[in-house]
């Protein structure tokens, strides 16, 4: 695991070295998620899940491409502290689009991390803003700042009636799902109230970190109105996946390596049903990133 630079005094800290350290954490979060195995329906070290157009190497190349853009989100967040927070998102969009273009170049057109560019871009901009304002940088303050950036986002982008609906607008109108936009605008409640406390508690109990992350993924899958799942399997597919994850948790979750057999079975069922909980995977990346944020001494 890549060490995080420690700085002896605040006076010696240069913002760029801190930005690079936080960017490395976000990069490691993406790698930690994709390498985690076995994951139901998702690309991992064992198989490509319910995907026929992407593989593990695509995610590694994508994460490396995105990594170099993350400090720019922080720099932008630091540069616009005089703007009201709800005005920040407009300036982040060009950065996000450029980062997406770098991802697509690295993967020859495969969408591996578009959701993570959105969430990590928001959180990195929040880091820059809070650092510049000399405010505490914690999981809670980062998610609250991201929520401020996204104020009114779901109303603007999901509730409007276009002649040609986007996938997100269609799922919102049909099923009431707000997806990544709604989670961000609400301050990532699935992470702050559920996944992050759950993951921290398991680690405090001495649970193996990989098993703890797999258990946390199940928790997210059981709670998340995942638009990736709904776009593939509709309301029935989403309901089935949530129920299967909840049943595994009720039976004790992923406590020991012996429990991985249940995840292998769940993975095969997701592949057969063509279901991939990519939204929950994105939230797991956010969870791991926020769990490690205190490693960077600032």
UniProtKB/Swiss-Prot annotation:
Give yes or no: UniProt keyword ATP-binding. yes
Presence of the UniProt keyword Nucleotide-binding in the record = yes
User: Which GO MF terms does the UniProt record name?
Assistant: ATP binding; triphosphoribosyl-dephospho-CoA synthase activity
Task: Name a single GO biological process.
Answer: prosthetic group biosynthetic process
Q: Which reactions are catalysed by this chain? A: 3'-dephospho-CoA + ATP = 2'-(5''-triphospho-alpha-D-ribosyl)-3'-dephospho-CoA + adenine
E.C. number = 2.4.2.52
- Cleaved signal peptide residues: none
Keywords on record: ATP-binding, Nucleotide-binding, Transferase
**Alphabetized Pfam families for the sequence:** CitG
Q: Which HAMAP family match?
A: CitG
Give the family per the record: Belongs to the CitG/MdcB family.
Q: Which PANTHER family match?
A: 2-(5''-TRIPHOSPHORIBOSYL)-3'-DEPHOSPHOCOENZYME-A SYNTHASE, TRIPHOSPHORIBOSYL-DEPHOSPHO-COA SYNTHASE
UniProt-recorded name of the protein: Probable 2-(5''-triphosphoribosyl)-3'-dephosphocoenzyme-A synthase 2
| Species of the source | Salmonella choleraesuis (strain SC-B67)
């Amino acid at each position: 695991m890549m060490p995080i630079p420690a700085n002896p005094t605040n006076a010696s800290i240069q913002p760029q070295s801190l930005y690079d350290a936080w960017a490395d954490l976000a990069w490691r979060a993406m790698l930690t998620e994709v390498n985690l195995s076995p994951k139901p329906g998702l690309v991992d070290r064992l198989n490509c899940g319910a995907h026929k157009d992407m593989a593990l190497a695509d995610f590694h190349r994508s994460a490396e491409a995105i990594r170099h853009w993350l400090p720019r989100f922080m720099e932008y967040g630091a540069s616009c502290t005089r703007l009201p927070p709800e005005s920040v998102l407009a300036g982040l969009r060009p950065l996000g689009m450029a980062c997406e273009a770098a991802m697509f170049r690295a993967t020859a057109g495969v969408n591996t991390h578009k959701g993570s560019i959105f969430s990590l871009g928001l959180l990195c901009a929040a880091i820059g803003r809070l650092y510049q304002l000399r405010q505490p940088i914690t999981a809670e303050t980062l998610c609250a700042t991201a929520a401020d950036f996204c104020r009114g986002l779901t109303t603007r982008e999901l509730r409007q009636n276009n002649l040609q609906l986007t996938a997100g607008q269609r799922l919102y109108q049909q099923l009431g799902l707000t997806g990544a936009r709604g989670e961000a605008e609400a301050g990532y409640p699935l992470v702050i109230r559920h996944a992050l406390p759950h993951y921290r508690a398991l680690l405090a109990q001495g649970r193996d970190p990989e098993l703890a992350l797999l258990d946390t993924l199940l928790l997210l899958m059981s709670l998340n109105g995942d638009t990736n799942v709904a776009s593939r399997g509709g309301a029935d597919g989403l309901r089935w996946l949530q129920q299967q994850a909840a049943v595994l948790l009720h039976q004790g979750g992923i406590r020991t390596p012996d429990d991985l057999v249940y995840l292998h079975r769940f993975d095969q069922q997701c592949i057969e049903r063509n279901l991939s909980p990519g939204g929950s995977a994105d939230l797991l990346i956010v969870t791991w990133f926020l769990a490690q944020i205190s490693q960077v001494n600032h």
